[in-house]
Amino acid sequence: MKAKTDDGIRLLVAVAGHYEKIVPAGTRGVVLECYNNPEGYIVDISIPDPNELSGYRYDCIEVAPEQFEINQERLNELVHS
């Protein structure tokens, strides 16, 4: 498997989010669940959005291994915190 639970990721392509919203390439997130057959991942993501009170729009999406890369910055944060 490409990733494991709690790995940080960065999307390589835009993917469909919920409510007809598009999650842009470059969006970062965290793996919540991993599936083996077929390989897939549930990822919690946050997208900057000035229209939201928090400044972010949150979504939980399904991604395939070819749609993301491991975010080394997130891994370093976890190791050094």
Feature locations, PLM:
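Basic/aromatic-rich interaction segments and small domains that mediate binding to polyanionic partners
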Residues: 2-81
